[in-house]
């Protein structure tokens, strides 16, 4: 695939970063301090923009450092707890473990590289590391998104289908994880062998798939990639949680009607919605889908802006979109790990200071069959 070529510049690291005075002069282009070995990868579109304010680079660097620490600690603890506790190594929790592992690898592979480039205010690691960085972002991002999808579908299978559903076994869970990684590897390798390419983004401190070149090759990749790595898992997540909430709402309604027939106020010890299975599942569903949208949709919109030649795309918007997408690695351990009651119990045993609030599971006064069904739904939430 033909790429844009720019003339080599007399740029060197000694005059980059905070010491590069031309950055603050208000003159020149963002491409003025691109390294010669990266010049042929940069799209000429970005030449119209002035260099990013050095203060913004510092802010982005500190923000990236903060989310890296939070994410690596949070996901590291989830991997340690779920992987090191035999009672938690269930088929469903293997998917949670896979999600935490991919999120950990995402931040461990992306954040240090971004911080280095934020300091120098350009990509200083060469074309090879551009491919490695962008490839890791694509690989672990795809694994995380599809892990979330498989988790949602597992909840759908247990809560909606119930005894009519096929229980997931360790073997089934491992097969799903292998499928996720094989698909992610496929989409990661394609730009390396000619279907699209990995190139620097507008601010020159990060690399991603090429969404600026006006050719069918990169366009076809981005459209197909977004179909399989965004729209398909999004549809499956929404589909699963829609029927989960509907099923639990029907169960709650049946319990209330049964309570009326028995001439009691409730079959539960409390009608507090926050403590009911319906309330918990609704919160998890809303949180999951909302955070998923918040993290990834802005970056997809940025890619489509470039794909369809829409004005308004700037180096600053591209880097904030890329950085914000990575915050999904911070949300996931909270949604999928800390909300897990048994996880909180084990975490309190191994690290009491890491747990806030009560870790005791509620014990409603209900018939055994109702309690068992509700507890199963709660644990899946």
Swiss-Prot record:
Gene3D superfamilies: Rhodopsin 7-helix transmembrane proteins. Residues 359-381 are annotated as: Disordered. Residues 1-56, 120-133, 197-220, 308-314 are extracellular. One of its GO terms (molecular function) is G protein-coupled receptor activity. Coiled coil: none annotated. Residues 370-381 have a biased composition (Polar residues). It is a multi-pass membrane protein. Its main location: membrane. InterPro entries: GPCR_opsins, GPCR_Rhodpsn, GPCR_Rhodpsn_7TM, Opsin, Opsin_RH1/RH2, Retinal_BS. Keywords: Chromophore, Disulfide bond, G-protein coupled receptor, Glycoprotein, Membrane, Phosphoprotein, Photoreceptor protein, Receptor, Retinal protein, Sensory transduction, Transducer, Transmembrane, Transmembrane helix, Vision. The modification N6-(retinylidene)lysine is found at residue 326. Pfam families: 7tm_1. GO terms for biological process: G protein-coupled receptor signaling pathway; phototransduction; visual perception. The keyword Membrane applies. GO terms for cellular component: membrane; plasma membrane. Disulfide bonds join 130-207. Phosphorylated on some or all of the serine and threonine residues present in the C-terminal region. Visual pigments are the light-absorbing molecules that mediate vision. They consist of an apoprotein, opsin, covalently linked to cis-retinal. This is Opsin Rh2. The gene is Rh2.
């Amino acid at each position: 695939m033909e790429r844009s070529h720019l003339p080599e510049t007399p740029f060197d690291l000694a005059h980059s970063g905070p010491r590069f005075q031309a950055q603050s002069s208000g003159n020149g282009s963002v491409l003025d301090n691109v390294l010669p070995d990266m010049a042929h990868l940069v799209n000429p579109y970005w030449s119209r923009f002035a260099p990013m304010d050095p203060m913004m680079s510092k802010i982005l660097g500190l923000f990236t450092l903060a989310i890296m620490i939070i994410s690596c600690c949070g996901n590291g603890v989830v991997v340690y707890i779920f992987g090191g506790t035999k009672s938690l190594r269930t088929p469903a929790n293997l998917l949670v473990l896979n999600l935490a592992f991919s999120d950990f690898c995402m931040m461990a592979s992306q954040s240090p590289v971004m911080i280095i480039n934020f300091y120098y205010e350009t990509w200083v690691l060469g074309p090879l590391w551009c491919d490695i960085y962008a490839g890791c972002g694509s690989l672990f991002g795809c694994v995380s998104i599809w892990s979330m999808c498989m988790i949602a579908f597992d909840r759908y299978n247990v809560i909606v289908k119930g005894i009519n559903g096929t229980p997931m076994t360790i073997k089934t869970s491992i097969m799903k994880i292998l499928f996720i990684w094989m698909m992610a590897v496929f989409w990661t390798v394609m730009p390396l062998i000619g279907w699209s390419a990995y190139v620097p983004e507008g601010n020159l401190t990060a690399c991603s798939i090429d969404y600026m070149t006006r050719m069918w090759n990169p366009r076809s990749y981005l459209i197909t990639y977004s179909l399989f790595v965004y729209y398909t898992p999004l549809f499956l997540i929404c589909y699963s949680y829609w029927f989960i909430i509907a099923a639990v709402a029907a169960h709650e309604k049946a319990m209330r009607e049964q309570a009326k027939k028995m001439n009691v106020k409730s079959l539960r010890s409390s009608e507090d919605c926050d403590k009911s299975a319906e309330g918990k599942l609704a919160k998890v569903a809303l949180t999951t889908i909302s955070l998923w949208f918040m993290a990834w949709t802005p970056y997809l919109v940025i890619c489509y802006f470039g794909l369809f030649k829409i004005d308004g795309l700037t180096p600053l918007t591209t880097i904030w979109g890329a950085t914000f997408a990575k915050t999904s690695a911070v949300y996931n351990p909270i949604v999928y790990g800390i909300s897990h009651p048994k996880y909180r119990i084990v975490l309190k045993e191994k690290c009491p200071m890491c747990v806030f609030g009560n870790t005791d599971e509620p014990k409603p006064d209900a018939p055994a069959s109702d309690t068992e069904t509700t507890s199963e739904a709660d644990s899946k939430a």
